[in-house]
Amino acid sequence: MSHFGRSGPPDISDTYSLLVLNITFRTTADDLYPLFAKYGKVVDVFIPRDRRTGDSRGFAFVRYKYKDEAHKAVERLDGRVVDGREITVQFAKYGPNAEKISKGRVVEPPPKSRRSRSRSPRRSRSPRRSRSPPRRRSPRRSRSPRRRSRDDYREKDYRKRSRSRSYDRRERHEEKDRDHRRRTRSRSASPDEKRRVRGRYDNESRSHSRSLSASPARRSPRSSSPQKTSPAREVSPDKRSNERSPSPRRSLSPRSPALQKASPSKEMSPERRSNERSPSPGSPAPLRKVDAASRSQSPYAAE
C-alpha cells in the first residue's frame, strides 16, 4: 500500500530508500508519512502486505529525494515508539545484499567470519566431497562400468567362442587330412600287404604240413619211411628177394634131420650169420660162394 494511492508508484530512480521495521499490523502509510516528512522531501511510503490475507507484513519502505535528508531521518527516528512499538530505521538494501525480513524484523545471517570458521571443518567435510562417493555410485556412473564390463565379458566370450570354433575347425580339418592320408596309404600299400600276408600264410601252411608229415615217423618207429631207410636196404633188391624166398636147402632141412646134421652149412660161424642177417652192399660174392658150396654138398646136387 502506497501513500499516493491510485496515482501509481512514483518515479523512484535516483532516490534513497529507508527500511522501517517492527511496525504494527494497524499502522498505515498515512500514519508514517507526516512522521518522516519532517526531515525532508518524502517521495514514497510503501507497506508490503500478504496476498492471501491482505494484512501488513510488519515493515515499510520510505524514499527520500536527497541522501542527507535520509541520513537525518535515520538518526532521529531510529528507536522511536510508534503505535506502541519501537521501530527500527535503516537504509534498505537491494539485490544480493538485501536483508531477509521475517515478521517485521531482519533476520541477520551469521557473520562471514563465523561462517568461514564454522564451515571450515564442514568444508573439509563439504557436501561435494561427502557427496562425491555417492555421485561415483550414481546410477549413471555405476552403470557405465557395469555396461563396459558386460561388453568386455561379451567380447571376451565372443573371442573365446571364435577361438574355440577356429580350433574345432582346425582339428576337424586335421582329422580329415589324417583320414585321407590313412586311406591313401592303405590303398597304396594294400597289394604289398596282401603279398606279405599270403607269403606268411603259405609259409605257415608249409611248416604245418611238414610237422604233420614228420610227426608219425617220430612217434611210430616201426613204420619205416622211404627217406629214413638205410642205403643198404635201398640198394640190394636181390637180397630182399633172397630173404623173402628161402633157399631149397632151408626148406628141406626140417624134413630130413639126418641131412641137417651132415650138412656143414648149419655149422657156420657167427660172422656169416651176421652177414646173412645184415648184408652190406659189398658182400654179394661170399654169399654166392656159400650157395655153391651148399649146393655141392646137398644130396640133390650129387644126384
Swiss-Prot record:
Residues 16-94 form the RRM domain. Residues 294-303 have a biased composition (Polar residues). It is found in: Nucleus speckle. One of its GO terms (cellular component) is spliceosomal complex. Residues 149-158, 165-178, 190-207 have a biased composition (Basic and acidic residues). One of its GO terms (biological process) is mRNA splicing, via spliceosome. Disruption phenotype: No effect on SCL33 alternative splicing. The keyword RNA-binding applies. Residues 210-226, 244-257 have a biased composition (Low complexity). Its main location: nucleus. Residues 100-303 are annotated as: Disordered. PANTHER family: GLYCINE-RICH RNA-BINDING PROTEIN RZ1A, SC35-LIKE SPLICING FACTOR. Probably involved in intron recognition and spliceosome assembly, but not involved in alternative splicing regulation of the SCL33 intron. Component of the spliceosome. Interacts with SNRNP35, CYP59 and RS2Z33. This is Serine/arginine-rich splicing factor SC35. It comes from Arabidopsis thaliana. The lineage of its organism: Eukaryota, Viridiplantae, Streptophyta, Embryophyta, Tracheophyta.
